């Protein structure tokens, strides 16, 4: 054989079987950076239709986690696939840089502002800390193979962006959406600040649940309303609450106008009590109170009790019964304790009745000095003292520890309170913002589509947006208010424009350094500067204007797509929608795509305490970024995304299948120069034409899946193509032709041309997902080409050919089915030790007329399709008794061991081996391929 080995076309490539991604990817990244790859892509798309995916900024604090990786990889897949589709798709990553978490980190290092360090110095420290965090996260994102303008990202703390945030607010004010009010807001006593809705988490908490009696100021008159005359006992209305600490701020009792309320007399411990309760809750309440007996004396509708007065249980004033739509009978008594300073519903109903918005609680959660009974006590510690006082006053009917879901601060994990404070709000209804936003939601495409109803419900029910915070590190609310009237300066909009220009030069510190007289002149004495900062959700929510609307690479084009985790319906999607609609009357996006959260193999959240955290840095260091990218692409992101070591190892297995296919293609393109060796599609061997046609059809399906953001379908189709159509069929069949045909002959060049077309297409299909591997393949493909696959478009030379009417896709599908049946019988013969490999087999196919016509169409080349040394087709009626039935009624098979000699070069067993004098160990075909013009193949 040694003489003939050198006549074979053995596969050869520098593309290694093992990816060694963890080591090789960083080398590729260095080259991408050195070559200015991102700018090359931008230059290649000048003048093309823009596609703008706007990056929702992660917070500049801490290392990236697997959720960040999912998000950035999904964005990168979209940007790269849109670029392949010919769009100019810039990607400018961003970071959210202001706000409390950074302040807390800096406080740990340098202390609180105004103590050891000035506020100005504190802001500078915050800026430095945020910049360090950005650097760390940026390196991790780049390592994932995400291409973008990493050297010029947008930061909400960039002077220009800070200035644009102020300009955005001035537009909101100009359009009449801002108002100042005293309102109850989520308040964290640890932060000492208001919280946005998105900063609130619900956790279980144990609270005192109490039933409290408010005695009527005129019990006899009230009993008469229930049809009971001359009643001698005190009559009380009973509330149920889990926040006893709010009772000092009680200003009313809310009841439902539609509900029936009963006057109930009950006896407990020998004492008679008369109480008013919702009729449907009477039995439950009597059981709860341990009543020995009870009697309903009368019923009235809630509406009849409006404005009846009741004494506060421990303060020297009385409060009215008022009507509210928020009253339910899910629990409690059907009467709601109403403290307008401590609850949103309470506030709304209180406004209707002109109730005082009392707030006896300070920033730190401690009662103010003038609070009777409880001054200086922390509200949660005061709960027990309130209960004790109620007991002492005879107003406590029941008290129990109650476990319930309660709002907590997402940073401190501590319970929060509702607390009325003077704040700045964007009104949802003054200028019809709610109505406009709901209309814009309908004009937006939500992926998955349930996102639409989710955000609609949130917009329908959300209160006015409190945009002010009492913090140091944030974009200032650059307003002047009158010292006496608290009214905004009449020239606020133009003043803000001037302040924004200063901030653009000097950053937000310019506002705190500003002497009001510089802008207001003599008026300065009448006005004071607002010292509040903006909610950081305003910072990020205005980036469609402050970044996309301002940077030149976006060409003033609106945003096509926002893509974030499903928690952002109430976060970034919401804040962006509110600001954009308030500024322009339009949504800031055309499409909004959400992905689920990552969970472990058992469906649990990632948690350090459970020990199930999978860090992206560990995955890239061990398996490589392409494995992580393949897992992201292959997972249906519309639900929870399950990840574990086992799942990532399965991704690595799938990756190896794709890599091995790419390696086979490259190895068999050895010595192929498309400029001179490419065979026109119409001149190819029929099977090669089929392979190119299949690739063309698959490309259409893959492009469509990319366009619909169905990346798991891309990976499914790719795996199917590599494993079945290529791996188990086409590549298997062509090995013989590739290795043994004449090197320059048509049979081999036809096959190489098909492999070249498939490789050119496939490297583009995988580029958005397996970016490192695609680059590696691209560098080794034959022929003249640009430096990077990422500047290319989908492969245009995949012609969908229809020349083969008789050898259609259906024809080859049938042949594949027949081949699978033959393989089963050959496999059985191998197990029975009747043959070794399939080339030791002679197969006889007994087929009906229709199948016979198909099988004989390709003549002697049928044996190459079946990978046997001989294949004969005979009528089904002639089937011998030893013929094996198959799953096809039209086919029976007999497999026998060949008696012919084995060709030393191609390993086929042929009768002529040993009869050719010059080459006694070869078959005719091999002799032709060595010495003659090369074999002729038409079909396979």
Curated annotation (Swiss-Prot):
Main enzyme class: ligase
PROSITE patterns (UniProt xref): AA_TRNA_LIGASE_I (PS00178)
Q: Which reaction does it catalyse?
A: tRNA(Ile) + L-isoleucine + ATP = L-isoleucyl-tRNA(Ile) + AMP + diphosphate
Signal sequence span is: none
Q: Where does the protein end up?
A: Cytoplasm
Q: Which domain of life is it from?
A: Bacteria
Q: Which residues bind L-isoleucyl-5'-AMP?
A: 564
Molecular function GO terms recorded: aminoacyl-tRNA deacylase activity; ATP binding; isoleucine-tRNA ligase activity; tRNA binding; zinc ion binding
Q: What is its EC number?
A: 6.1.1.5
Look up the record and report any one GO term of the cellular component aspect. cytosol
- So what family is this one in? Belongs to the class-I aminoacyl-tRNA synthetase family. IleS type 1 subfamily.
Q: How does it assemble?
A: Monomer.
The record's note on its domains:
IleRS has two distinct active sites: one for aminoacylation and one for editing. The misactivated valine is translocated from the active site to the editing site, which sterically excludes the correctly activated isoleucine. The single editing site contains two valyl binding pockets, one specific for each substrate (Val-AMP or Val-tRNA(Ile)).
| UniProt-recorded name of the protein | Isoleucine--tRNA ligase
Species annotation: Shewanella sp. (strain MR-7)
Q: Which gene encodes it?
A: ileS
């Amino acid at each position: 054989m040694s003489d003939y080995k050198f006549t074979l076309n053995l596969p050869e490539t520098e593309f290694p079987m093992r990816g060694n991604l963890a080591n090789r990817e960083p080398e590729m990244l260095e080259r991408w950076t050195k070559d200015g790859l991102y700018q090359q892509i931008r230059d290649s798309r000048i003048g093309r239709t823009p596609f703008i995916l706007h990056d929702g900024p992660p917070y500049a604090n801490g290392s990236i986690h697997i959720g960040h990786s999912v998000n950035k990889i999904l964005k990168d897949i979209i940007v790269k696939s849109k670029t392949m589709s010919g769009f100019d798709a810039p990607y400018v990553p961003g970071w959210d840089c202001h706000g409390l978490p950074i302040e807390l980190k800096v406080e740990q290092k340098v202390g609180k502002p105004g103590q050891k360090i000035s506020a100005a110095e504190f802001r500078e420290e915050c800026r430095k800390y945020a910049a360090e965090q950005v650097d760390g996260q940026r390196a991790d994102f780049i390592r994932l193979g995400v291409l973008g303008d990493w050297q010029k990202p947008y930061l909400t703390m960039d002077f220009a962006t800070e200035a644009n945030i102020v300009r955005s607010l001035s537009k909101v004010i100009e359009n009449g959406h801002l108002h100042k009010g005293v309102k109850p807001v989520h308040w964290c006593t640890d932060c000492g600040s208001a919280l946005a809705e998105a900063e609130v988490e619900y956790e279980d908490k144990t609270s005192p649940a109490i039933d409290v009696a408010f005695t009527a100021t005129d019990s006899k008159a009230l009993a008469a309303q229930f049809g009971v005359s001359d009643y001698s006992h005190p009559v009380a209305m009973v509330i149920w609450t889990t926040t006893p600490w709010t009772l000092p701020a009680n200003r009313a009792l809310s009841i439902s106008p539609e509900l029936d309320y009963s006057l109930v007399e009950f006896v407990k411990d020998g004492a008679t009590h008369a109480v008013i309760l919702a009729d449907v809750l009477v039995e439950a309440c009597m059981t709860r109170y341990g009543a020995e007996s009870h009697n309903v004396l009368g019923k009235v509708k809630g509406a009849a009790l409006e404005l009846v007065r009741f004494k506060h249980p421990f303060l020297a004033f009385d409060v009215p019964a008022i009507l509210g739509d928020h009253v339910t009978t899910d629990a409690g008594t059907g009467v709601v304790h109403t403290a307008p300073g401590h609850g949103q519903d309470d506030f709304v109903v209180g406004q209707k009745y002109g109730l005082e918005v009392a707030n006896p609680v300070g920033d730190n959660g401690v009662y103010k000095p003038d609070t009777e009974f409880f001054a200086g006590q922390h509200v949660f510690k005061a709960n027990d003292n309130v209960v004790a006082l109620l007991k002492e006053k005879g107003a406590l009917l029941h008290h129990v520890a109650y476990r319930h879901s309660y709002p907590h601060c997402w940073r401190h994990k501590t319970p929060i309170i509702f607390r009325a404070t003077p704040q700045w709000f964007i009104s949802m209804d003054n200028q019809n913002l709610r109505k406009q936003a709901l209309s814009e939601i309908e004009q937006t495409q939500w992926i998955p589509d349930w996102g639409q109803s989710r955000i609609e419900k949130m917009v329908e029910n959300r209160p006015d947006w409190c945009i002010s915070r009492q913090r140091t590190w944030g974009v200032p609310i650059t307003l002047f208010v009158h010292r006496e009237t608290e009214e905004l300066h009449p020239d606020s909009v133009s003043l803000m424009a001037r302040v924004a220009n200063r901030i653009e030069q000097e950053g937000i510190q310019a506002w705190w350094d500003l002497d009001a007289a510089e802008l207001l002149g003599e008026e300065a004495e009448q006005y004071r500067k607002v010292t509040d900062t903006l909610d950081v959700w305003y910072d990020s929510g205005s980036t469609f204007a402050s970044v996309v609307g301002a940077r030149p690479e976006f060409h003033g084009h609106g945003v096509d797509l926002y893509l974030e985790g499903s928690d952002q319906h109430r976060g970034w999607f919401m804040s962006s929608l509110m600001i954009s609609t308030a500024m322009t009357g339009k949504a800031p996006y055309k499409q909004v795509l959400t992905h689920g959260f990552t969970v472990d193999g058992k469906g649990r959240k990632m948690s350090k305490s459970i020990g199930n955290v999978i860090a992206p840095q560990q995955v890239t260091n061990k398996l490589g970024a392409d494995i992580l990218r393949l897992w992201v692409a292959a997972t249906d992101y519309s639900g929870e995304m399950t990840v574990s070591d086992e799942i990532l190892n399965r991704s690595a297995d799938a990756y190896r299948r794709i890599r091995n296919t790419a390696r086979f293609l490259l190895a068999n393109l050895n010595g192929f120069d498309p400029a001179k060796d490419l065979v026109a599609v119409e001149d190819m061997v029929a099977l090669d034409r089929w392979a190119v046609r299949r690739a063309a059809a698959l490309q259409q399906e893959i492009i469509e899946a990319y366009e619909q953001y169905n990346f798991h379908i891309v990976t499914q189709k790719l795996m199917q193509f590599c494993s079945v159509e290529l791996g188990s069929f086409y590549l298997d069949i062509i090995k013989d032709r590739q290795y043994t045909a004449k090197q320059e002959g048509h049979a081999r060049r036809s096959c190489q041309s098909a492999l070249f077309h498939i490789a050119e297409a496939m490297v583009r299909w995988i580029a958005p997902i397996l970016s490192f591997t695609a680059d590696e393949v691209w560098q080794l493909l034959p022929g003249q080409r640009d430096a990077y696959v990422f500047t290319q478009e989908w492969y245009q030379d995949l012609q969908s050919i229809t020349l083969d009417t008789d050898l259609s896709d259906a024809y080859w599908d049938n042949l594949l089915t027949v081949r699978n049946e033959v393989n089963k019988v050959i496999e059985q013969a191998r197990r029975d030790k009747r043959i070794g490999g399939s080339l030791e087999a002679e197969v006889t196919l007994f087929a009906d007329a229709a199948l016979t016509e198909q099988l004989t169409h390709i003549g002697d080349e049928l044996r190459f399709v079946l990978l046997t040394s001989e294949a004969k087709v005979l009528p089904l009626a002639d089937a011998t008794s030893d013929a094996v039935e198959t799953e096809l009624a039209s086919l029976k098979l007999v497999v026998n061991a060949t008696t012919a000699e084995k060709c030393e070069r191609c390993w086929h067993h042929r009768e002529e081996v040993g009869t050719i004098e010059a080459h006694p160990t070869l078959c005719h075909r091999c002799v032709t391929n060595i010495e003659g013009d090369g074999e002729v193949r038409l079909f396979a």
